[in-house]
A protein has these predicted regions:
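Alpha/beta enzyme core
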Residues: 24-29, 62, 75-286, 295-315, ...
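N-terminal amphipathic alpha-helix/helix-capping segment at the start of soluble metabolic enzymes
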Residues: 1-78, 83, 116-125, 273
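Short, highly charged low-complexity linear segments
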Residues: 2, 130, 345-349
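C-terminal helical cap(s) of enzyme catalytic domains, especially alpha/beta-barrels
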Residues: 311-312, 322-349
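Hydrophobic alpha-helical scaffolding
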Residues: 42, 264, 294-295, 327
Length: 349
């Protein structure tokens, strides 16, 4: 099915939108020359540049500047039973790797246990991204905190080219997490690895008057900006669903131009604001695919990919939509996401 058909009645809304907030000429648009154009002038060492090129240079999107990553850390983050019950095949780590390879992904991101179980067989066949920290839901009552499950050196020794970590910005533990992840990323760069940060918000006060601002463009944009400050090479963020979190909750510092000139209510403009907060796209923005909703997954994934690409983002990191269904359907979904980035007619807004 063609991309335009999957978008349905809103195809023109997404495909023909012109961004009049932050001009595309200001954005470092992903392309085959990302290493030379962006990272060559940075303080990243030669080995880290090699690791970034390994990510950029694998899978169906190889050497386009875009990335498609399969993340499967939900066995810890959301519990293994809840995550894999729809398709028990993925209790076995090898099938996670097979989905990423057969799905044409640039890389697979998962836990120390998952990747370590099959590292000798697969680390040279697809780039590994080891997730350093997790929140687990077996503590009662549930507490939301990211804790380290292993070390950067362990990730290096299993052949990983990159490490990933989550910070719950806005949470009581966020400042400790910032310090921990900053130190881990510094060491990863020293060892020649790339770094990816899950820049998530977590605070019950971010829900106000029936509106959830955990995906507000202004709040997520600032989370991204802190993330690139501690030298994330790629930032993972939820696609913005609203704006004005700072104003609604009544905290932080704002400028009215953030809302009147730099954003509108169009999802591409809201995502463009996220991209801008990653040093105008120098640090690539990958948006998350979100939970699986069944029949609408393909449509939802294509919408997210189109918004991300047209905003100036670098790609999609889609897990549950891909692995909570038969493998052939998961492969089809991943390939369809990649088709958006391979389609030259889908341009930067």
């Amino acid at each position: 099915m063609k991309i335009v058909d999957l978008l349905g009645g809103k195809a023109e809304y997404y495909l023909n939108h012109t961004c009049k907030t932050i001009d595309k000429q200001l954005i470092h648009i992903p392309g085959p020359d990302m290493i030379d154009k962006v990272w060559m002038n940075s303080d990243r060492n030669i080995r880290t540049l090699e690791s970034l090129q390994a990510l950029y240079g694998h899978g169906r999107l190889a050497n386009t500047g875009y990335v498609s990553i399969l993340p499967v850390d939900q066995g810890i983050e959301h519990s293994a039973g809840a995550s894999f019950a729809p398709n028990p095949l993925y209790f076995d780590p090898e099938n996670i790797i097979k989905l990423a390879i057969e799905g044409g992904c640039n890389a697979v991101a998962s836990t120390f246990g998952v990747l370590g179980a099959v590292a000798r067989k697969y680390a040279h066949k697809i780039p590994f991204i080891v997730k350093l920290n997790h929140n687990e839901l077996l503590t009662y009552p549930n507490s939301y905190d990211q804790v380290m499950f292993g070390t950067v050196k362990e990730a290096l020794n299993m052949g990983a080219v990159a490490v990933g970590a989550t910070i719950y910005f806005g949470s009581e533990q966020s400042r400790r997490q910032i310090v921990e992840v900053s130190q881990a990323f510094e060491y990863a760069h020293e060892l020649g690895m790339a770094t990816i940060l899950w820049c998530y918000l977590r605070n019950s006060s971010f829900k106000k008057d029936g509106t959830d601002y955990h995906a507000a463009a202004d709040l997520t944009g600032q989370a991204n900006h802190i993330g690139v400050t501690i030298k994330a090479d790629i930032v993972k963020q939820k696609l913005p669903s609203n704006n004005g979190g700072f104003k609604a909750i009544g905290f932080g510092k704002t400028n009215e131009c953030m809302y009147s000139e730099l954003t509108t209510d169009h999802p591409i403009d809201l995502c463009r604001y996220q991209v801008a907060n990653g040093y105008m796209g120098r640090v690539g923005l990958i948006n998350s695919g979100g939970e699986s909703h069944g029949e609408s997954d393909l449509h939802d994934a294509v919408v997210t990919a189109v918004v991300n690409k047209r905003a100036g983002g670098m790609g999609l990191i889609s897990g549950r939509k891909a692995f909570q269904k038969p493998m052939k359907d998961g492969i089809q979904l991943l390939n369809t996401i990649q088709d958006v980035y391979l389609d030259s007619s889908i341009t930067i807004a």
